[in-house]
Swiss-Prot record:
Belongs to the DEFL family. Its main location: secreted. The keyword Signal applies. It comes from the Eukaryota. The gene is PDF1.4. Confers broad-spectrum resistance to pathogens. It comes from Arabidopsis thaliana. This is Defensin-like protein 19.
Length: 78
C-alpha cells in the first residue's frame, strides 16, 4: 500500500515539473531598451510605464538607475 502511494506521488510530481518547464518556454524573452521618448530624470515609474505602453508599444516600462541618474527603460517581447 505504501509503495503504491509513493509511486502515485512520484508520478504526480513528475507531471507537475514537466508541465511547469513547458510553461516557461512559452513565455519568451523580454528585451530592455532605454526609452526613445522619455526625456530628463525618471522619478515616476508609473509615468514611464504608461509612456512606454502608449508611445513605444512596449509591454511595460520602469525607471532604473543609469549613471548619472535615473532613466526610463521600456521592455519589449523579443
Amino acid at each position: 500500500m505504501a509503495s503504491s502511494y509513493t509511486l502515485m506521488l512520484f508520478l504526480c510530481l513528475s507531471i507537475f515539473l514537466i508541465a511547469s518547464t513547458e510553461m516557461m518556454a512559452v513565455e519568451g524573452r523580454i528585451c530592455e531598451r532605454r526609452s526613445k521618448t522619455w526625456t530628463g530624470f525618471c522619478g515616476n515609474t508609473r509615468g514611464c510605464d504608461s509612456q512606454c505602453k502608449r508611445w513605444e508599444r512596449a509591454s511595460h516600462g520602469a525607471c532604473h538607475a543609469q549613471f548619472p541618474g535615473f532613466a526610463c527603460f521600456c521592455y519589449f517581447n523579443c
